[in-house]
C-alpha cells in the first residue's frame, strides 16, 4: 500500500515536471515565432499558428489592469493625426487580466469612424467572435482564427489573426487582418507623464491585411502598417 502510494506521488511529480517542461518548450517556440513575425515585417505572409490556442482569451500582465488613455501614432504616415481612445482591462474569474473587448473595440471604432459606428457586440458563446454595427445597414463580422502569445510578467507580446466580413445590402467583402502587439512598461525617458499611480505603457502594433484567400499560406500581405502606442493610466 505504502509502495503504491509513494509510486503514485512520484508519478504525479514527474507529470508536473513534464508539464512544466512542455509549457516552457511551447513558450520558447512561441517567442521564436513572434520574434520572427516582428523581424519579417513588413514582408509578412499569412501566419501559420502552430501553437495557437483560441480557447483562451489574451492574458495581459497584471500592470495592465485598469483604465487607460491610449495614443496611437501611424509611423508609416506622418500626416495622420494620432488616434486617441480609452481602453479597459480587468481581472476575470480566474484572476487573469483580460481586455474588455467590446468596450475597447467600440472606443477604438468611435475614434476612427466617429458617428458612423453604432455599437460593438461580443458573441456570448465565443470569445473569438464580435459584430460591429455601422450606419446604412453595414456591419462587420469578426472571427479570430489564430492566437499566439508568450507568458512574460514584464512584457505583453502576442499575435492574432482575424477574418473580417463586411456585410452591406446586396454584397459582402472578406478580409484577413493580422495584429502583432508588443508592449512593456515605459522607460522614464520614453514617458512624458508624471502619473505616479502606474507607469505608462509603451509599445508597437504591426498590422497586416491579406485579403480574402483564407488559409492560403503563400498569401503575401496586401498592406502593412506600424503604430507606436502609449498608454497613460486614468482613474475612470
Task: Tell where the protein language model's regions lie, with residue ranges.
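Amphipathic/hydrophobic helical signal segments and adjacent flexible N-terminal regions
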Residues: 20-67, 71-113, 209-236
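Short secondary-structure boundary segments
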Residues: 10, 26, 138-140
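Surface-exposed, polar helix/loop patches in the mature regions of secreted/periplasmic/lumenal proteins
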Residues: 90-146
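Short helix-loop boundary/capping segments
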Residues: 124-218
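Classical Sec-dependent N-terminal signal peptides that target proteins to the secretory pathway
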Residues: 1-24
Amino acid at each position: 500500500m505504502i509502495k503504491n502510494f509513494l509510486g503514485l506521488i512520484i508519478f504525479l511529480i514527474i507529470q508536473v515536471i513534464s508539464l512544466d517542461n512542455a509549457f516552457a518548450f511551447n513558450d520558447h517556440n512561441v517567442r521564436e515565432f513572434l520574434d520572427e513575425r516582428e523581424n519579417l515585417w513588413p514582408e509578412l505572409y499569412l501566419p501559420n499558428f502552430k501553437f495557437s490556442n483560441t480557447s483562451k482569451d489574451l492574458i495581459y500582465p497584471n500592470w495592465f489592469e485598469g483604465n487607460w488613455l491610449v495614443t496611437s501614432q501611424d509611423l508609416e504616415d506622418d500626416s495622420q493625426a494620432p488616434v486617441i481612445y480609452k481602453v479597459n482591462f480587468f481581472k476575470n474569474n480566474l484572476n487573469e487580466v483580460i481586455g474588455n473587448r467590446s468596450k475597447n473595440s467600440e472606443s477604438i471604432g468611435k475614434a476612427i469612424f466617429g458617428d458612423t459606428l453604432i455599437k460593438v457586440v461580443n458573441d456570448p458563446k465565443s470569445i473569438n467572435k464580435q459584430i460591429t454595427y455601422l450606419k446604412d445597414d453595414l456591419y462587420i463580422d469578426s472571427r479570430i482564427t489564430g492566437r499566439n502569445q508568450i507568458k512574460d510578467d514584464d512584457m505583453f507580446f502576442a499575435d492574432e489573426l482575424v477574418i473580417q466580413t463586411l456585410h452591406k445590402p446586396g454584397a459582402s467583402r472578406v478580409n484577413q487582418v493580422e495584429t502583432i502587439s508588443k508592449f512593456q512598461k515605459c522607460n522614464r525617458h520614453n514617458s512624458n507623464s508624471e502619473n505616479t499611480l502606474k507607469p505608462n505603457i509603451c509599445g508597437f502594433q504591426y498590422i497586416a491585411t491579406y485579403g480574402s484567400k483564407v488559409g492560403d499560406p503563400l498569401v503575401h500581405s496586401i498592406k502593412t502598417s506600424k503604430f507606436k502606442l502609449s498608454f497613460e493610466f486614468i482613474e475612470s
